[in-house]
From Swiss-Prot:
Keywords on record: Anion exchange, Antiport, Cell membrane, Coiled coil, Cytoplasmic vesicle, Disulfide bond, Glycoprotein, Ion transport, Membrane, Sodium, Sodium transport, Synapse, Transmembrane, Transmembrane helix, Transport, Zinc
Superkingdom per UniProt: Eukaryota
Protein name (database record): Electroneutral sodium bicarbonate exchanger 1
Task performed by this protein: Mediates electroneutral sodium- and carbonate-dependent chloride-HCO3(-) exchange with a Na(+):HCO3(-) stoichiometry of 2:1. Plays a major role in pH regulation in neurons. Mediates sodium reabsorption in the renal cortical collecting ducts.
Membrane-spanning intervals of the chain: 479-499, 524-544, 566-586, 596-616, 688-708, 732-752, 779-799, 825-845, 882-902, 905-925, 963-983
Any coiled-coil regions, as ranges: 1010-1036
Positions on the Extracellular side per record topology: 1-478, 545-565, 617-687, 753-778, 846-881, 926-962
All ranges on the Cytoplasmic side of the membrane: 500-523, 587-595, 709-731, 800-824, 903-904, 984-1093
Membrane topology classification: Multi-pass membrane protein
Glycosylation sites: 646
């Protein structure tokens, strides 16, 4: 961004073009930039010629000729006479159109754009020492400067440039030497070729040439060398040590590890895979930590500026090497150099040269100019790139901005694709149709029309990735995810088993729940389509089990046998759904339904975590109004009940207890509760004596676990410690929290409630085994009647499984190995049937656990430029974490001695963390925060730019109403119909098409699939529009090939349609400015001076 507030230098630079007469720009710069494309060139643009190899340039170094010399332009002019009218229009193309034409050329091997690292070096002279090139700034994406003290790099920041320095840079390229596709192997050869071109115009005599050559070949001193040259490093920061430890090992060509200490000088295999044996690299001078941030295959762009006392006018050269060459000692990091920009001038204008160098380096980091620099064939192409850059910059008012302020790099850099798109006749840019949100319309959800067709395609899609699902798990991140989720999964499984045991009088309890979860999870992780999904128990299943058990008890039926029949019918119906590709209906589940369902599950997790903590007050009561002076008078003793109930009397009778012989006052709390005694005294609560400290200590454990987990998870973005340490702490955040809290709880010694794990592997009740007879003592007709509740169960399983699968498989997660909706449902169905036969609980996809699993396996770019936010790359897709979670869960019976130390409040804190963290990224909660927020304070959400705020609020209110209804049903005795209500959300969303336009819904939600008839109508309408557009093009007489039309929107032809006075051509308007006229006049004076000398 040019900062208009910068002060203009005392004088403007004068340049002389060395390879021909000085070009004096008197306001007609557009004529210099006229690109006379011949008809044959336009017709051949974007055309692939097979089997024809064209030379990229001359092989001789001595006869290397700059692009844009007189005879070339004459040739162009001769060709132009054949198509005068078309080329006259082309002469007035905007820089944007010219750049689009340049970028449309076919790429060859030598002109494929690479990532660029740009370094700015300036000549530095110290008293009593020889001059040397000193690194003063560098760019990988953002600018970093060597601070004034010379001891450290600045923080990366967005470069702000003065408009004057950009004009001077443009003048440099017009009047300086431009050498494209130079073949050279060393800085000496490059210097000679540049000076040869300068001598052609008699600008340099022999003595000046020698001095300039000496200046170009001076030693380069880089900032990282200063630390390494210190002979006595007394203090080394922990961060620097961490950098060394976290650097990747460098490998020599034999695969052996190379360290800077062991091999001071060796041939380094550069990151683009080229090994330059003639350019040895001293590893001791390489900043290995910074090298890690350089992308693989990157090339260097070196900007050399400085003052030389013998010169009376600047020497400017822009060089593109072909191929790129590793120039030893020139660049801070050992990567091949592709571009060089050299500016040497008289003494007294060092700051001016510095700003021009910054402008050159900054413009090389621009995505569009970067590509133009690689594909340019002549000087005019580079000028078009600069003009296009100037056409896009933003100017800051001088009175409202301080140029010394450093702008922080943005979190998200906007895409530059629109700058590459061709224009349309009205002068606007053709916008790419964006996909605001990811839908579910991929090939995985298309009906095949064949029996089990979708399942077969799922297997074919997932089979090639199967072994990679195990290889990709070789990462510490997977270990952290596994340890965290094992602890997170254990507690709900055991809690669910305990609740089920209470509801079924011990027929299915904790040990059955552990065994069922382990067996189902292992099978699912091994063979499911989407192994990132974590299976768990759900609330509606528990409600169903309670209702079924009560029904069986009322009608004297065998609960486990009837349950087995229902489970087998449910499994069969699910397999029927797989066979008929019913999972394709998932495409009707849009973001509206997903977010309502996911939000409800997250809120339930948060609510139940807090509810369980509050419930501890009943087990561990406290005396809220204690009088400290009466502490010695408080007591609580066990006594004989005054009015024992029938249950108590029967217990005493069964155990032969004679109440008169029992010393009730001497019994412990557990003994008193076991013998059905009563507690009496001023320190007694409803269920026993007041318990000191336990409830408050549990609260401390609960909230500390949540806060510490959240803090450690965000530690990755903190400013402390090296990157690898921060990443490891972030990955292991929850496990470290649990471990820390267990140690603290053990050391404090307060008897907090602990995780209770069954210690013996056998059924809870002795009157049942591991295999259940589906008929058993029940009448035969119960087998057929079981299909009725099985239908409801099937809807429950299908909705829970597929909504969770849809959330996991969203396009935002960038999954690369495909989905497997049909295969997932098949595995759930098979294991549901197995669990029914064995009398084990049913397990289906658990939404919050699955979201947490995915979030713990997020991948971010490791090689990010300084100041650039790491990019989200996707999810580490593998099967091992899920497999290990459930394998270890099955072994938990043998780990009771360890697991008994885990306090339950810590696990409740983990539930709270999982619920809160899963809410992040749910758009519904972002929209909910907009209520009551003034418009000026609202975040810049993309949908707020395209949808009126009242429509956003209406959409949110409808979603909130549905969420409240779901909550009410979930908490009521009618919770068994909860899946039906989730299904009803799909119909609610369909009705919303009447209240919102298609465009509004595309930003707020996913578009629902339309009917077949509507699709056919839209296809016919689109075909008709294309046909009319073709007719209009034919009437317009557009003779360009189709590909050229798409790329250029017909260069030159657009101009004939351009009648909007607001449209300008920056190349035409720039020469009219006073600044440019001053530069041109100075250039003219320089020419006259050179002629008369």
């Amino acid at each position: 961004m040019p900062a208009a507030g910068s002060n203009e230098p005392d004088g403007v630079l004068s340049y002389q073009r060395p390879d021909e007469e000085a070009v004096v720009d008197q306001g007609g710069t557009s004529t210099i930039l006229n690109i006379h494309y011949e008809k044959e060139e336009l017709e051949g643009h974007r055309t692939l010629y097979v089997g024809v190899r064209m030379p990229l340039g001359r092989q001789s170094h001595r006869h290397h000729r700059t692009h844009g010399q007189k005879h070339r332009r004459r040739g162009r002019g001769k060709g132009a006479s054949q198509g005068e009218e078309g080329l006259e229009a082309l002469a007035h193309d905007t820089p944007s159109q010219r750049v689009q034409f340049i970028l449309g050329t076919e790429e060859d091997e030598e002109h494929v754009p690479h990532e660029l690292f740009t370094e700015l070096d300036e000549i530095c002279m110290k008293e009593g020492e020889d001059a040397e090139w000193k690194e003063t700034a560098r760019w990988l994406k953002f600018e970093e400067d060597v601070e004034d003290g010379g001891e450290r790099w600045s923080k990366p920041y967005v470069a702000t440039l003065s408009l004057h320095s950009l004009f001077e840079l443009r003048s440099c390229l017009i009047n300086g030497t431009v050498l494209l596709d130079m073949h050279a192997n060393s800085i000496e050869e490059i210097s000679d070729l540049i000076l040869d071109q300068q001598e052609l115009s008699s600008d340099l005599n022999d003595s000046m040439r020698v001095k300039v050559r000496e200046a170009l070949l001076k030693k380069h001193h880089h900032q990282n060398e200063k630390k390494r040259n210190n002979l006595i490093p007394i203090v080394r920061s922990f961060a620097e040590v961490g950098k060394k430890q976290s650097d990747p090992h460098l490998m020599d060509k034999h695969g052996q590890t190379v360290s800077p200490q062991s091999v001071p000088t060796t041939n380094l295999e550069v990151k683009n895979g080229v090994n330059c044996e003639h350019s040895p690299v001293d590893l001791s001078k390489v900043d290995l930590h910074f090298m890690k941030k350089i992308p693989t295959g990157a090339e260097a762009s070196n900007v050399l500026v400085g003052e030389v006392d013998i010169l009376d006018r600047p020497i400017v050269a822009f060089v593109r090497l072909s191929p790129a060459v590793l120039l030893s000692g020139l660049t801070e990091v050992p990567i091949p150099t592709r571009f060089l920009f050299i500016l040497l001038g008289p003494v007294g204008k060092g700051q001016q040269y510095h700003e021009i160098g910054r402008s050159m380096a900054t413009i090389m980091t621009d995505e569009i100019f970067h590509d133009v620099a690689y594909k340019a064939k002549e000087r005019d192409d580079l000028l078009a790139g600069i003009d296009e850059f100037l056409d896009q910059v933003t100017v800051l008012p001088p009175g409202e901005w301080d140029p010394s302020i450093r702008i922080e790099p943005p979190k998200n850099v906007p895409s530059q694709e629109k700058r590459k798109m061709p224009g349309v006749p009205n002068g606007n840019v053709c916008h790419i149709e964006q996909e605001p949100h990811g839908g579910h319309s991929g090939p995985e959800l298309q009906r095949t029309g064949r029996l089990f067709g979708g399942l077969v395609l799922d297997i074919k899609r997932k089979a090639p990735w199967y072994w990679s699902d195990y290889r990709d798990a070789l990462s510490l991140q997977c270990l952290a995810s596994f340890l965290f989720l094992y602890c997170a999964c254990m507690s709900p499984v055991i809690t669910f088993g305990g609740l089920l045991g209470e509801a079924t009088e011990g027929r299915i309890s904790a040990i059955e729940s552990l065994f069922g979860a382990s067996m189902t999870g292992i099978a699912y992780s091994l063979f499911a389509g989407q192994a990132l999904t974590i299976l768990g128990s759900t609330g509606p299943v528990l409600v169903f089990e309670k209702i079924l058990f009560k029904f069986c008890k009322d009608y004297a039926l065998s609960y486990l046998s009837l349950r087995a029949c229902i489970g087998l019918w449910t499994a069969f119906l699910c397999i029927v759904l797989v066979a008929t590709d019913a999972s394709s209906l998932v495409c009707y589940i849009t973001r509206f339904t997903e977010e309502a369902f996911a939000s409800l599950i997250c809120i339930i997790f948060i609510y139940e975590a807090i509810e369980k903590l509050i419930h501890l007050a009943e087990t561990y009561p406290i005396h809220m109004h204690s009088q400290l002076d009466h502490l010695s008078l408080y007591y609580c003793r066990c006594t004989l009940p005054e009015n024992p109930n029938n249950h108590t009397l029967q217990y005493w009778k069964d155990h032969n207890i004679v109440t008169a012989e029992v010393h009730w006052a001497n019994l412990t709390v557990s003994e008193c509760q076991e013998m059905h005694g009563e507690f009496m005294g001023s320190a007694c609560g409803h269920h026993g004596p007041y318990t000191p400290d336990v409830l408050f200590w549990s609260c401390i454990l609960f909230f500390t676990t949540f806060i510490l987990s959240s803090t450690l998870k965000t530690f990755k973005t903190s400013r402390y410690f090296p990157t690898r340490v921060r990443s490891m702490v972030s990955d292991f955040a929850v496990f470290l929290t649990i471990f820390t809290m267990v140690i603290i709880d053990f050391l404090i010694g307060v008897p907090s409630p602990k995780l209770q794990v069954p210690s013996v592997f056998k059924p809870t009740r002795d009157d049942r085994g591991w295999i259940i007879n589906p008929i058993g003592p029940n009448p035969w007709w119960t087998v057929i009647a079981a299909i009725i509740p099985a239908l409801l169960c099937t809807i429950l399983i299908f909705m829970d499984q597929q909504i969770t699968a849809v959330i996991i498989n969203r396009k935002e997660h960038k999954l690369k190995k495909g989905c497997g909706y049909h295969l997932d449902l098949l595995m759930v169905a098979i294991m549901l049937g197995v669990c029914s036969i064995m009398g084990l609980p049913w397990f289906v996809a658990a939404t919050v656990l699955s979201i947490t699993h995915v979030n713990s396996l997020k991948l971010e770019s490791e090689c990010s430029a300084p100041g650039e936010q790491p990019k989200f790359l996707g999810i580490r897709e593998q099967r091992v974490t899920g497999l290990m979670i459930f394998v270890l869960m099955g072994c938990s019976v043998f780990m009771t001695a360890i697991l008994k130390f885990i306090p339950m409040p810590v696990l409740y804190g983990v539930f709270l963390y999982m619920g809160v963290s899963s809410l992040q990224g749910i758009q519904f909660f972002d929209r909910l925060k907009l209520f009551g927020m003034p418009a000026k304070h609202q975040p810049d959400f993309i949908y707020l730019r395209h949808v009126p705020l009242r429509k956003v609020h209406l959409f949110t209110l409808i979603q909130l109403t549905c969420l409240v209804l779901l909550w009410v049903i979930k908490a009521s005795p009618a919770a068994i119909v909860f899946p039906m209500m989730v299904l009803a959300l799909v119909f609610v969303r369909k009705v919303m098409d009447l209240c919102f336009s298609k465009r509004e819904l595309s930003w707020l939600d996913d578009l629902m699939p339309e009917s077949k008839k509507k699709k056919l109508d839209d296809a016919k309408k689109k075909a008709k529009e294309e046909e009319e557009a073709e007719k209009m093009l034919e009437i317009g007489g557009d003779k360009f090939p189709l590909e050229s039309r798409k790329l250029l929107s017909s260069p030159g032809k657009n101009i004939s349609c351009r009648c909007d006075p607001s449209e300008i051509n920056i190349s035409d308007e720039m020469p009219k400015t006073t600044v440019w006229k001053a530069l041109s006049m100075n250039s003219g004076n320089a020419k006259e001076k050179s002629l008369f000398n």
